[in-house]
Amino acid sequence: CYLTFDDGPSDNTLLILEILRKYGIKATFFVINSEKLDYVKNIYEAGHTVGLHSATHNYGEIYKSTQAYLDDLKVISDRVESIIGIAPKVMRFPGGSSNSVSRKYCAGVMSSLTRAVEELGYSYYDWNVSSGDALSETPSFTYIRNNVLKGARDKNSACVLMHDSDTKTTTVKALPEIIEGLMKMGYSFEPITPEAYGYHHNTLN
């Protein structure tokens, strides 16, 4: 099982790291150019995977062309490299490769981007279990927990989408029960690496 957290680092990052430490679990953080970006050092030094997400997470800007997203990706890559000394080669598109929002700005851009990032040596990862914590209102921790445990049931491998932004306090609250529930299902936990199985959605552009 791969636990993944998008949109951090945030005020919740250190809390998430402490929970993961308690359970002896490594996870993956797909980061943006946030005010708390220095926390990528904490993530990296704790043995988790730092992945790239976006510098701005502004759909209208990053998805207006293939080059626009690649330029944005370079910004966050350079920032992360300046902090931890390496440029990550794993990444996740905002909204995933199956997002339908991008076609409002540039039809076909996701098909172009999935090829372009791989040509640049990146491995991109979507997910096959969603926590549902991306709702505009903060969902309850039971809703988040139940989504993950129901979604992971009867799967051979799970890649769980969660979020690490300032408002996601209920994700933090749900995390211990998510981990314990997944353990009871027999899951072990690993961080994503470029060699990991690629969870790819169908592009909808």
Region annotations inferred by a language model:
Residues 15, 59-161, 165-183, 187-188, ...:
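Catalytic domains of cell-wall/extracellular-matrix polysaccharide-remodeling enzymes
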